[in-house]
């Protein structure tokens, strides 16, 4: 099974149409990948579905980079990187 990081990168790549090679933990959804507010809502929904978690709106607003999404999911799933 793919790691959380690999699965998040796959989802971001697919949702935003970006090559996986351009996505790192430091990649900003808005500044680096050009995501708009609708893109970020769709990403959050996709991540919630993939990992069977709930991301509250206040937490979702704080997730600006790929690594922050990975860290949040790992914390929710009780896994350490």
Curated annotation (Swiss-Prot):
* Keywords per UniProt: Cytoplasm, Fatty acid biosynthesis, Fatty acid metabolism, Lipid biosynthesis, Lipid metabolism, Phosphopantetheine, Phosphoprotein
Q: Where are the transmembrane segments?
A: none
Q: Which GO terms describe its biological process?
A: lipid A biosynthetic process
Please name the InterPro entries in this protein's record.
Answer: ACP (IPR003231), ACP-like_sf (IPR036736), PP-bd_ACP (IPR009081), Ppantetheine_attach_site (IPR006162)
Q: Where found in the cell?
A: Cytoplasm
Major location, coarse class? cytoplasm
Please describe the post-translational modifications of this protein. 4'-phosphopantetheine is transferred from CoA to a specific serine of apo-ACP by AcpS. This modification is essential for activity because fatty acids are bound in thioester linkage to the sulfhydryl of the prosthetic group.
Q: Which GO terms describe its molecular function?
A: acyl binding; acyl carrier activity
The record's section on Pfam families has: PP-binding
Q: Which residues in this protein are found as O-(pantetheine 4'-phosphoryl)serine?
A: 37
Pathway it belongs to? Lipid metabolism; fatty acid biosynthesis
Carrier domain segment(s) = 2-77
One GO cellular component assignment for this chain's record is: cytosol
The reply on keyword Lipid metabolism is: yes
Q: What is the recorded function of this protein according to its Swiss-Prot or TrEMBL entry?
A: Carrier of the growing fatty acid chain in fatty acid biosynthesis.
HAMAP family per record? Acyl_carrier (MF_01217)
Which family is annotated? Belongs to the acyl carrier protein (ACP) family.
Tell me the protein's name.
Answer: Acyl carrier protein
- Protein's organism: Rhodopirellula baltica (strain DSM 10527 / NCIMB 13988 / SH1)
**Underlying gene:** acpP
């Amino acid at each position: 099974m793919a790691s959380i990081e690999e699965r998040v990168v796959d989802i971001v790549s697919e949702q935003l149409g970006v090559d996986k090679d351009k996505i790192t933990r430091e990649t900003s959804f808005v500044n680096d990948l050009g995501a708009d507010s609708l893109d970020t809502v769709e990403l959050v929904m996709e991540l919630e579905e993939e990992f069977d978690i709930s991301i509250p709106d206040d937490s979702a607003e704080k997730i600006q980079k790929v690594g922050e999404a990975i860290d949040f999911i790992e914390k929710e799933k009780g896994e350490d990187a």
